[in-house]
């Protein structure tokens, strides 16, 4: 396998067993090696971000946030907006594309089960367009 991969698709590569079994070492390779994160899986990105927090590795956190920002800009939809919003809120991060998506789709979003699961502060944040969180 080429060590200078241009694209890393975590979902596909997980099934090809390219990882060593040591997720910490694999995660470090994303930052210090030649790999970039190209997965569009929100759950994989959250898992990697949590690992970066556990390792206190700011470079890995930055790489994951960069990819989550891309997902937020180009891939966000009705199936993943809630998970992405929760990720940004829980980590005290902001994203203008997420805010724009929510504002543009509020009529559809407010009638979803995910919206009904929000606490009062989150609902007020979304409905009032208060950019203190996202």
UniProtKB/Swiss-Prot annotation:
Q: State whether keyword Ion transport applies.
A: no
Residue ranges of every copy of the BACK domain listed in the record: 88-133
UniProt protein name: Protein OPG030
- Induction (record text): Expressed in the early phase of the viral replicative cycle.
Superkingdom, natural source: Viruses
Q: Family per UniProt?
A: Belongs to the orthopoxvirus OPG030 family.
> Which InterPro entries does the entry link to?
Orthopox_C5
Identify the keywords attached in UniProt to this record, alphabetized.
Early protein
What is the originating organism of this protein? Variola virus (isolate Human/India/Ind3/1967) (VARV)
